[in-house]
Design a protein with these regions (language model features):
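Intracellular loop-helix junctions on the cytosolic face of multi-pass helical membrane proteins
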Residues: 1-11, 103-110, 121-122, 126, ...
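Helix-loop boundary and gating motifs at the non-cytosolic
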Residues: 2-57, 249-254, 258-283
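Helix-to-loop junctions at the C-terminal end of transmembrane segments
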Residues: 64-78, 308-322, 406
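Hydrophobic core of transmembrane alpha-helices in multi-pass small-molecule transporters
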Residues: 95-99, 103-122, 348-362
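Intracellular juxtamembrane helix-capping segments at the cytosolic ends
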Residues: 121-134, 362-376
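C-terminal transmembrane helical hairpin of 12-TM major facilitator-type secondary transporters
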Residues: 317-367
Length: 462
C-alpha cells in the first residue's frame, strides 16, 4: 500500500503491533545483563568473552537481511511479517528456558547461537511492520513506541534477579562455579513474557495485503519453492546494496563506530561494576554475584532513561531534525561512558548510565526513521535487514579484535573497555554531521521548505 494512502492508526493500534517487541527485548535484556557472568561461572576467561559473544552479530548479519528479503516477497493467510516473528519467538523461548541450566560452557554458547538466531528472525519483521503499516507522519511515533518496548523489556529483565533475591530466591554461586537460582528463574519468567507478548501482537494486529494480490502471487510462484525464494533473497540483497541511497551509505559510518563500541557495554559493564564498586574481580570473590546483579540495575537506569526519551524524541526530531538529534544524543552517551573512569561509587556509576540511555534511545530509533524515509516502500524489509548488517559487521570486528589488546591497551580492566566505548560514541557523533539532509522525514523537510519560503517572502516585503 502506498504510504500516502495508509490510514492514521490510533495509539493503541500502534501499541498492539509493537507489543511483541516487549517479550523479545526481555530476552535480549536477560542476555545482555547475565551472559558474561554465566560464561564466567562456567569457566570462561575474561579476555575471551568477546569471541564467545560472536553469535549475536554473526546471526544478525546472516539472518536479518535474508528474513527481510523473503518477507518482502511473502504473503500467507497469517500475513507477511507475522509468520517470521512467530517462529522466532517460539524457538527463542526454548533457548531462553534452557540457557541458565547449562552445565558446560559449550552448552551455553550453543544455546546462545540458537537464541540469537531466533531473536533476529523475530526482530526484523517487527521493525519492517512499522514501515508497512504506518504513513510518514506516524513512523516516528511507531519507532518511538518500539523504543519504549525495548526499554520496558530490558528494564524488567534487569530488575528481575534483584526482585527474586528480595523474595528469598538464592544467589549462591557455590564458589563461583554455579549459575545462581536468581538468574535461572529470571530466564524461566522470560519464556512466559516472550510467548504472551508475541501472542498479543499476533491476535490484535492485521497486515495490509499487497496492492495487487494476484500479480504478487504470480511473481512469487515464478520464484519457485523455499530454496528458490532463498536464491531470490540473495539476489534482492545484492541489488539493494548496489542501489543503496547515499544517505544510507553515510549512516554506515555512524554505525561502524557506535556498534564497535557497544559490545563493550554488554560484555564488561557488569564485570566492571563488580570489580570497581564491589571489589570483586573474579567469580569466586564474595560479592561477585551482588556486583554482577548491579549490572542489571545499570541497564535499568539506562532503559528508564530510554523510556522517558521515547516520549521526547518525536518533539526533539521535529525541532532539530534527525541528524542533529542523532549526534547530540550520541555525545551524551560518550560522556556517560567516559565519566565512569572518574568514580567507583555505585550511585555515580549508575548516574552515568543516564547519558548512555539518552544515546541508546537514538541508536535504536533514529536510523530506522531515516531509512524508512529514503528507501522504496516495497524494499523496506531488505533495507531493514541491511541496516542490521551495519550493526553486525562492527560487532564481529570487535569480537575478533578485542582479545588482541584487552590485556595490553585496556590493561585487563573492563572499565577501560567502557571508556573506549565512549570514545567510539563521540566519533560516531562526528560522522552524523556528514549524513545528507535527504534522510529527514518528509514532514520535517516540508516544514523546513515552508519556513524558507516564509523567510523569502518576508525578505521580499522588506
Amino acid at each position: 500500500m502506498n504510504t500516502s494512502k495508509k490510514p492514521m492508526l490510533s495509539f493503541w493500534q500502534i501499541w498492539n503491533m509493537s507489543f511483541g517487541f516487549l517479550g523479545i527485548q526481555y530476552g535480549f535484556g536477560l542476555q545482555q545483563a547475565n551472559l558474561s557472568p554465566i560464561f564466567r561461572y562456567l569457566g570462561a576467561d575474561e579476555s575471551k568473552l568477546a569471541v564467545l559473544w560472536l553469535a549475536g552479530p554473526v546471526t544478525g548479519l546472516l539472518i536479518q537481511p535474508i528474513i527481510g528479503a523473503i518477507s518482502d516477497g511473502t504473503w500467507t493467510r497469517f500475513g507477511r511479517r507475522k509468520p517470521f516473528f512467530l517462529i522466532g519467538a517460539l524457538t527463542g523461548s526454548v533457548a531462553v528456558l534452557l540457557m541458565p541450566y547449562s552445565s558446560a560452557l559449550w552448552m551455553a554458547v550453543g544455546l546462545f547461537w540458537i537464541l540469537d538466531a531466533s531473536m533476529n528472525t523475530a526482530m526484523e519483521p517487527y521493525r519492517a511492520m512499522v514501515g508497512d503499516k504506518l504513513n510518514d507522519k506516524q513512523r516516528t511515533l511507531g519507532f518511538s513506541v518500539q523504543t519504549f518496548m525495548i526499554a520496558g523489556g530490558q528494564i524488567a529483565a534487569g530488575f528481575m534477579p534483584l526482585l527474586l533475591l528480595s523474595l528469598g530466591v538464592s544467589d549462591d554461586t557455590q564458589g563461583g562455579k554455579h549459575i545462581p537460582n536468581i538468574v535461572k528463574y529470571s530466564f524461566v519468567i522470560g519464556v512466559v513474557a516472550m510467548l504472551v507478548s508475541m501472542a498479543w501482537t499476533n491476535f490484535t494486529t492485521d497486515e495490509y495485503p499487497p496492492d495487487n494480490l494476484e500479480e504478487f502471487r504470480a511473481e512469487q510462484a515464478a520464484k519457485g519453492g523455499f530454496f528458490g525464494k532463498i536464491g531470490h533473497a540473495f539476489k534482492d540483497i545484492w541489488e539493494a546494496v548496489i542501489d543503496m541511497p547515499q544517505g544510507l551509505r553515510r549512516i554506515w559510518w555512524v554505525k561502524l563506530f557506535t556498534w564497535y563500541g557497544l559490545p563493550f557495554m554488554w560484555q564488561y559493564l557488569s564485570l566492571s561494576i563488580a570489580r570497581h564498586s564491589f571489589n570483586a574481580p573474579t567469580p569466586d570473590s564474595p560479592n561477585f554475584a551482588e556486583g554482577a546483579s548491579y549490572g542489571g540495575i545499570a541497564f535499568i537506569v539506562m532503559n528508564v532513561t530510554t523510556v522517558v526519551m521515547a516520549f521526547l524524541l518525536p518533539s526533539i526530531v521535529k525541532a532539530i531534525g534527525t541528524r542533529m538529534t542523532y549526534a547530540v544524543l550520541l555525545v551524551c552517551g560518550g560522556i556517560g561512558f567516559i565519566s565512569m573512569l572518574l568514580t567507583t561509587n555505585i550511585t555515580l556509576v549508575l548516574s552515568c548510565m543516564i547519558g548512555v540511555g539518552i544515546a541508546w534511545s537514538a541508536i535504536i530509533t533514529i536510523p530506522f526513521i531515516m531509512t524508512t524515509s529514503i528507501v522504496p516502500q516495497k524494499r523496506i524489509g531488505v533495507y531493514m535487514g541491511l541496516l542490521n548488517a551495519f550493526i553486525c559487521i562492527p560487532q564481529i570486528f570487535n569480537n575478533l579484535t578485542v582479545g588482541f589488546y584487552y590485556d595490553t591497551l585496556l590493561k585487563g580492566d573492563p572499565r577501560n573497555a567502557l571508556v573506549l566505548c565512549g570514545i567510539c560514541f563521540i566519533l560516531a557523533a562526528v560522522c552524523c554531521l556528514f549524513i545528507p539532509k535527504t534522510v529527514e522525514p518528509k514532514y520535517i523537510t516540508e516544514i523546513d521548505e515552508q519556513e524558507e519560503n516564509l523567510q523569502g517572502d518576508f525578505a521580499a516585503v522588506k
